[in-house]
């Protein structure tokens, strides 16, 4: 990444930040002024390591991880004060997950403003991973702007409100393995057995791992995921949806 950010790139970043529609006077003012250090931080948040090995989004992504968890905790405390600690942890895990970050990144069309090197540009397997990572870095940069969580919550709370309603109406969508285990226990069945096979060696490949779920020795569902955990979760969701469709659930 060049030390001097050209005018075209500055305008691109400003247009993107305005498109987020963050309802904050402070944010609007700082963007309007085109503060150099702020633009630099957001440019860094939108630069992949394949373009610049030193100044890229990795540090802001690490920072954004902690910021995101705190902002989500704030949201849950305000919106669902009656929730137990366990329920809060389960919900938060979903609204800060890699899958959720990728979905948000696609919603805000972050990919169009991410600077990538030639290697990453041609790597379709890492596309979703980069979108999620850059979105998390964007959140880190937003916090860094003001050294405050306020703007992060002003941006994300409305999104979380919609998503949490959907998740809470169908708990299996965010806690599929636990829901499946409870269902098996309620039917006096053996607990589900998860069989994982690595079918690809590519990092970020959404089909890197395959998972079969067996109940009483019979294969009931299969799914893929970029990690063991995601493959198991996806297979459990598919199986519960199958049970709902057939009236078993």
What feature does the model see in each segment?
Residues 1-249:
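Double-stranded RNA-binding/processing signature
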């Amino acid at each position: 990444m060049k030390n001097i950010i050209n005018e075209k790139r500055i305008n691109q970043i400003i247009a993107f930040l305005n498109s987020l529609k963050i309802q904050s006077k402070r944010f609007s003012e700082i963007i309007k002024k085109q503060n150099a250090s702020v633009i630099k931080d957001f440019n860094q948040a939108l630069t992949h390591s394949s373009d610049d090995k030193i100044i890229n989004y990795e540090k802001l992504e690490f920072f954004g991880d902690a910021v995101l968890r705190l902002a989500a905790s704030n949201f849950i405390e305000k919106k669902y004060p009656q929730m137990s600690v366990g329920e809060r942890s389960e919900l938060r895990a979903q609204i800060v997950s890699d899958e959720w970050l990728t979905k948000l990144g696609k919603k805000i069309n972050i990919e169009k403003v991410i600077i990538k090197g030639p290697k990453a540009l041609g790597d379709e397997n890492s596309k979703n991973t980069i979108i999620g990572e850059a979105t998390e870095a964007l959140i880190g940069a937003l916090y860094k702007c003001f050294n405050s969580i306020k703007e992060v919550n002003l941006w994300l709370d409305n999104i979380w409100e919609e998503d949490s309603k959907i998740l809470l109406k169908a708990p299996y969508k965010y806690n599929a393995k636990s829901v499946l285990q409870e269902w098996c226990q309620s039917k006096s069945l053996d607990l589900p057995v998860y069989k994982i096979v690595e079918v690809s060696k590519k990092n970020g490949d959404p089909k890197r791992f395959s998972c079969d779920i067996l109940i009483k020795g019979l294969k009931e569902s299969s799914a893929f995921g970029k990690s063991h955990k995601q493959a198991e979760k996806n297979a459990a969701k598919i199986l519960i949806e199958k049970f709902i469709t057939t009236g078993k659930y």
